[in-house]
Amino acid sequence: MRRPHFDVRSSRWILTLFLVCAIAFAGCGGDESGDEAAGDAPDADDVAITIEEGDRSPAITGAAARFTSPENGAVLESGADVMVTVDVDSFEAGIQTETPRADAIANSENGQHVHIIVDGGPYYANYEPGSPFDVGMLPDGAHSAIVFPSRSYHESVKNAGAMDFVNFYVGEEAGTFPFDPDRPTIIYSRPKGLYTGVAAERIMLDFYLHNVALSEDGYTARYQIREEGGDEVLASTTLHEWTPSFVEGLPDGTYEIRLELLAADGNVVPG
């Protein structure tokens, strides 16, 4: 079985994420027969890969996350792990989100949580808001962290004001913050991680928007899926509303997902 990366490109942040995501299906067998089963899986050319726009899950009224540390503009110690603390309002971490979608796609047994994204990297899932959370050692210079609430199946809570950010330095006040709150921003969230069995049959794509709205005649969001290192687009969709989407038909393999924010003229918004 090949173990993939997702190469994720945001129109606001040009970034490369190395997210392990093996797409496998029930019946592949155990370790002894795994190679044979993976070899018999259909190629991407032999199946219909689709991206279907979905509906938002029911709203969690008033849910919001906010950083309480570090402070915006803080200069943190060089050579030490960076700790952030997040508080939440009208949101309960650690419980299952009670919707039919929780049984239909990959769902965390640890329940609801917040997604913390540092410098455009893969999100950290924090299941214990209110306690310091370690995001690791960061190089000296300018950094940005974003947080928003997430349902147990990793769909972001898209309430107005649900997201927060903090810009800070490590070691010295040098460099440019990756996140500019005054610019239109699209933030990649899902998929991430290892997908096997039933969870691999329907995979959610999700993102977060800041300072921008999608519409038929304005900004839009575009997904493109390719095999790792390939040029051919296997599936693509353009969204005019801020909703999750769902991928079906991906065989075993390694895939790259590109997420872009497009202006009304169809050009990628620089950033």
For every predicted segment, state its role:
Residues 2-15:
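Bacterial N-terminal signal peptides that target proteins for export
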Residues 24-27:
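C-terminal motif of bacterial Sec signal peptides marking the signal peptidase cleavage site
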